[in-house]
């Protein structure tokens, strides 16, 4: 079996990030971004998607977390794209609906090579989890979609607790991506009538 692993390093005047992923891992995570709540979300992503993930990142968080969170989306998008390779045998589509107590969220995606984000998640105005600005979650997923080439739809049906909403989003994302990148031996080549993705 081909090893579906990749790594990326990105250094700018604002951030310094390294990310490694194994799409066929067991959900092992080492995540150090200096943003505790974001570390928690990325660890959830690893565990519930069964991806092995190593993330190390630092940035100008004395200003705010925006640059680091967005650049982390760029890096995660790149490693997922690289790890998928030519997408031979891949299921391609993934969807998951996840409850978190009073919250219900669905993520549906297509590893089509066409980046597009639909994000229907509303946090209460000025919502934070600890010191983390929850509006940055959208910026993370936009950067991820743009750099992975994945069409990504994230829909919150309902929810009241902001922490629960964020967790449901990341868990559903993990499960949907895990489904989409899974291999089906019945698929010859890639799952497209065009012959490429």
From Swiss-Prot:
CDD domains: IGPD. It is found in: Cytoplasm. One of its GO terms (cellular component) is cytoplasm. Its main location: cytoplasm. The keyword Amino-acid biosynthesis applies. It is an enzyme of class 4 (lyase). Keywords: Amino-acid biosynthesis, Cytoplasm, Histidine biosynthesis, Lyase. Its EC number is 4.2.1.19. One of its GO terms (biological process) is L-histidine biosynthetic process. Coiled coil: none annotated. Disulfide bonds: none annotated. Pathway: Amino-acid biosynthesis; L-histidine biosynthesis; L-histidine from 5-phospho-alpha-D-ribose 1-diphosphate: step 6/9. InterPro entries: IGPD_sf, ImidazoleglycerolP_deHydtase, ImidazoleglycerP_deHydtase_CS, Ribosomal_Su5_D2-typ_SF. SUPFAM superfamilies: Ribosomal protein S5 domain 2-like. It catalyses: D-erythro-1-(imidazol-4-yl)glycerol 3-phosphate = 3-(imidazol-4-yl)-2-oxopropyl phosphate + H2O. Pfam families: IGPD. It comes from the Bacteria. GO terms for molecular function: imidazoleglycerol-phosphate dehydratase activity. HAMAP family: HisB. Belongs to the imidazoleglycerol-phosphate dehydratase family. This is Imidazoleglycerol-phosphate dehydratase. The lineage of its organism: Bacteria, Pseudomonadati, Thermodesulfobacteriota, Syntrophia, Syntrophales. The gene is hisB.
